[in-house]
Amino acid sequence: SSALLLYFNPEITITRGNKVPEDFEGIIFDIGRGKYDHHQRDSRIRENGIPYAAFGLLWEELGTEILGEELAAKFDESFIQPLDINDNTGEKNELATLIGNFNPSWDVENGENEAFSRAVQTAGMILVNMFEKYKGNERAEKRVEEILAAHNSSVLSGEKSESEAKILVFPEFVPCQKQLRETDIAFIIFPSNRGGYCIQPLKKEHSLNYLSLIHI
């Protein structure tokens, strides 16, 4: 939650505590029985039955401004919700365990604030990488749609033969396996960063694509 708020506004100051000061003005989360505190009997639950934690409540408020409505919903489902489940139930989550390992040992005096700062910094880097990954995937989907549309047009016009119809050539590498899985494309070709070209079969759920190639 702290990492998300700092991503949204790096100028804010995060203050830790178990009680909200009477004169406090700012965003309060995880305590205080307010909008972003899930430690309440009437705490909110998603339509799919997954309860919100503070992270999810803050993401609901800020996520669309970071990723847009569609991507924010996908990010909530795949990234936020598993962490909210962990926060609410203790169900194992590798990322939550990673961040939790920043907590100092039980017999170490003080050091909690420093450990918290390192944990937030690490969580912040993870968030930045995840945001960029989701944005990149969205750009890839649009690029694949463009290339596939041009390919299908060439097939319909007769410019490409029946055998060529199942081979999609990319002018550059674009992540596409998942997007093309339900199409008739069997192989993709794209430039290799080592020179020449790479040929990959499409990974179909119930079949394998094989092609004998001449060894050069």
Residue ranges and their predicted role:
Residues 2-72:
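Glycine/small-residue-rich interface belts in oligomeric ring/scaffold proteins
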Residues 3-6, 181-184, 204:
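Short, solvent-exposed amphipathic alpha-helical segments in soluble enzyme
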Residues 12-13, 26-27, 165-168, 185-188, ...:
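Structural motif
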Residues 33, 40, 174, 193, ...:
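A broadly conserved detector of short glycine/acidic/proline-rich loop/turn motifs that flank catalytic sites
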Residues 49-178, 190-194:
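A structured phosphate/pyrophosphate-recognition subdomain
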Residues 185-192, 208-210:
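Gly/Ser/Thr-rich active-site loops/lids in small-molecule metabolic enzymes
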Residues 200-212:
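A C-terminal functional module that forms or caps the active site or interfaces directly
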Residues 214-216:
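Conserved small/polar residues in nucleotide/adenosyl-binding loops
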